């Protein structure tokens, strides 16, 4: 059985995190992943405290295993969401889109295990000094907000830079990716794109079909001029956004253009106006499965690869 120190640290059976994808990672998906032995994560996104509290209660009504909440630090509700995870005794907080330092003391004092998503060695070192339990080193292959460094390059550098467990994210969709991440020094993986087509994922049918039909060149990154690049499946929206960006549109204009685009994709299935966030690995996601089947396939596949690799060493 594939088990690392991270499993013991978090009380999970399998070293697989489900990505905290906004408008996607809700109680339905998160509870299914946690029930399968991984770490299911609810995405707080730009929602207010009441929405998050309801999602936490819904998840706990389904199961009693460890789970996490992803706090998007750019959210206008970040302060109140940061308090909700304390009030609700959330066991794990994963942070994204910023530096969580201002909240970490309170979270640590509440006994919450804090795992920031980082795209650089510098941020990994900073949050480790502030008391992070672990970090998610996320490469540019990921869907959604991205950095500039690939997973293959980022993960080993972060592993060497900090003395806490590292979770690899970006471009991982099967056991080979999991095994590769472990060989780079990671103690777990975070997977987003493959869970988009999980049976328990509540995204629109349009979104799922686009992921299933994607190939290796189906995504593009936009928004670099704003300082907040995003990777999504190519669509009329990404084409229009890239055209505006290339024409010199301001960050404010681009921000207004993107407002609500992810919701239109995830909930409405609006092909023309939706932003279908997705990682470069989408071309390997070819079938619908339950969350349990996905978690088991990731872990079993990694075990098979790692055992087979031993035969290469004389």
Give the role of each language-model region.
Residues 1-165:
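Active-site entrance/lid segments in N-terminal catalytic domains of soluble metabolic enzymes
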Residues 22-23, 38-49, 136-148, 172-207:
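Glycine-rich phosphate-binding active-site loops on the catalytic face of alpha/beta enzymes
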Residues 153-167, 173-314:
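Conserved active-site-proximal phosphate/metal-binding subdomains
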